[in-house]
């Protein structure tokens, strides 16, 4: 059978958590032109990046095995954000730092000093919500975490996603209630 996540496919990206590759050319352009991502420009920047980077399949390599992920087309900002971070090697050498049995595993940003340096090169921003009832939180689903500071105060609920934190559902489907 054909390997759906063949690394030669133009629609796939590999995330190697142990590599130290050079930053993708598209990312270098964003950084060089002082085009850091901000809350004011995030929609346009991610839309432009998503148009140029059409991959929908991700392979996350870990010391415990590979994880195959498909990114939804109907969440173009989240898809583009994950691709941007993957292609800029943001996730390299990161860890899954939160594991809740039968619920989820969370990775991306961590408390390592180099993570702050990586974020400074990309920008400080949130990804606008792209909630779609067709995208179900079921086993294997990839999602971006909600910004922590917003759910500590229920009067300031904001469904924007943290650009640097993601989680993978272990068991589901899950409801939002």
Where are the language model's segments positioned?
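Cyclophilin-like peptidyl-prolyl cis-trans isomerases
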Residues: 1-177
């Amino acid at each position: 059978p054909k390997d759906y996540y063949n690394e030669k496919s133009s629609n796939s990206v590999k995330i190697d958590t142990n590599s130290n590759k050079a930053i993708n050319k598209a990312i270098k352009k964003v950084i060089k032109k002082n085009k850091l991502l901000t809350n004011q420009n995030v929609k346009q920047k991610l839309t432009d990046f998503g148009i140029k980077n059409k991959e929908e399949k991700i392979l996350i390599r870990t010391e415990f095995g590979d994880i195959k992920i498909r990114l939804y087309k109907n969440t173009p900002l989240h898809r583009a954000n994950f691709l941007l971070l993957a292609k800029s090697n943001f996730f390299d050498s990161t860890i899954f730092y939160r594991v809740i049995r039968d619920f989820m595993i969370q990775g991306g940003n961590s408390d390592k000093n180099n993570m702050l340096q990586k974020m400074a090169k990309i920008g400080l921003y949130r990804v606008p919500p792209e909630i779609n009832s067709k995208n179900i939180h079921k086993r294997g689903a990839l999602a971006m975490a909600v910004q922590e500071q917003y759910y500590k105060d229920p009067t300031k609920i904001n469904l924007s996603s943290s650009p640097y934190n993601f989680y993978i559902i272990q068991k589901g489907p899950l409801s939002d209630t």
